[in-house]
Amino acid sequence: MKNLSLLAVLLISNFCFSEYLEKLVIKKVVDGDTVHLYHDDTIYKVRLIEIDAPERNQPFGKDSTDYLKRLLNEGKVDVEISGTDRYGRKLGRLYWKGRDINREMVIAGYAWVYDDYVTDKSFYENQSKARELRKGLWKDSNSIPPWEWRKRKKQ
């Protein structure tokens, strides 16, 4: 029984772990939800959590990437890393001058709330408002979420 309790504590503590890094240099904006950051001689490939931006070859993909570049034009961000995805990218939330960049992408209509992975349900309010105001990708009433786009491309 003690072993099971210890295992549960270890699993929970590992799941809840997050690392906060400050003033990382932006090396590259890959697309609307992925960036490469530099800090202490390390390159971090970071996938923005809570959101899924259009793929580069998808309608609004370039717009989404360009918008993220504009948001990050000052060159340094803080990041809260909460894990690693199956591609080895760090999963994180970016902050620039106190602004939650992940949320800003949804507010501006350049990313969807990533239904399968969202933990902060308030992102849905931001998405509904962007849709209502027809911002960004919501200008097209038939826009396709990236997860559906990827699925269709595999077929």
Regions found by a protein language model. Give the residues of each.
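Small beta-barrel nucleic-acid-binding modules, primarily SNase/OB-fold domains
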Residues: 2-5, 14-155
